[in-house]
A protein has these predicted regions:
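Phosphate-coordination loops involved in phosphoryl transfer and adenosine-cofactor binding
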Residues: 25-27, 82, 154
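Glycine-rich dinucleotide-binding loop and its adjacent helix/turn
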Residues: 1-48, 145-146
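Cofactor-binding loop segments of dinucleotide-utilizing enzymes, especially the Rossmann-like FAD-
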Residues: 18, 34, 57-59, 162
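FAD-site-proximal beta/loop scaffold in flavoenzymes
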Residues: 6-23, 122-168, 173, 177
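Internal hydrophobic alpha-helix adjacent to the cofactor/substrate pocket in enzyme cavities
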Residues: 43, 47-53, 172-184
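A Rossmann-like FAD-binding core segment of flavoenzymes
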Residues: 47-147
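Short amphipathic alpha-helical segments
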Residues: 1-4, 42-44, 66-67, 130-133, ...
Length: 184
């Protein structure tokens, strides 16, 4: 996390484009990350915001080919490769992000990017390592369930919430999956 991330949470910083994207209709936003989640968030926000910057630390996207093509073909998405966010600024809410281009390189430079919204789309890892000894997980660490049920391969053991949900990662959906597990 960035030093001022919590200070601006709900005042320009968000971790959920589908939850907060409508606040940024016809505004300028940035999405941090280079994977599928970041591309999905950027694509969704592009339908609302006037401009979407994708801030990517690496010189390439880690996202699947189809997601890369989607963001690259969207006219109001601009990808800022080799940029690292170092801080946020603003008086009565978020006004921008401090960036370092090519950190640690000879041509490194720091600059500010004025934005209205800052969306975090990195570091989504399920908190499932405690259970990997007993339960099967996918390559990203999500606990595998049987079909669309919360049942795992271990009888009487259920997985609910974000540890079993690589797609939505929303509190209301996690609560619903908890209810499903309780009913099993």
């Amino acid at each position: 996390g960035l030093p001022d991330e919590q200070k601006y949470m709900g005042m320009g910083v968000s971790a959920c484009a589908t939850c907060d994207g409508f606040f940024y209709r016809r505004k300028v936003v940035a999405v941090v990350g280079g994977g599928d989640t970041a591309c999905e968030e950027a694509s969704y926000l592009a339908s609302l915001a006037s401009k979407v910057y994708m801030i990517v630390r690496k010189p390439y996207l880690r996202a699947s080919q189809i997601m890369q093509e989607r963001v690259m073909q969207t006219p109001n998405i601009e990808i800022l490769f080799e940029n690292t966010p170092t801080g946020l600024y603003g008086e009565n809410g978020l006004e921008g992000v401090h960036l370092t281009y090519r950190a640690g390189q000879e041509d490194q430079r720091e600059y500010d990017l004025d934005i209205d919204g800052f969306f975090l789309a990195i570091g989504h890892h399920p908190n499932s390592t405690l259970f990997t000894k007993w339960l099967e997980t996918d390559e990203a660490g999500y606990i595998k369930t049987i079909g669309d049920t919360p049942c795992t391969a271990v009888e009487g053991v259920y997985a609910a919430g974000d540890v079993a949900d690589p797609r939505y990662r929303q509190a209301i959906i996690a609560a619903g999956s908890g209810a499903k597990a309780a009913m099993e």
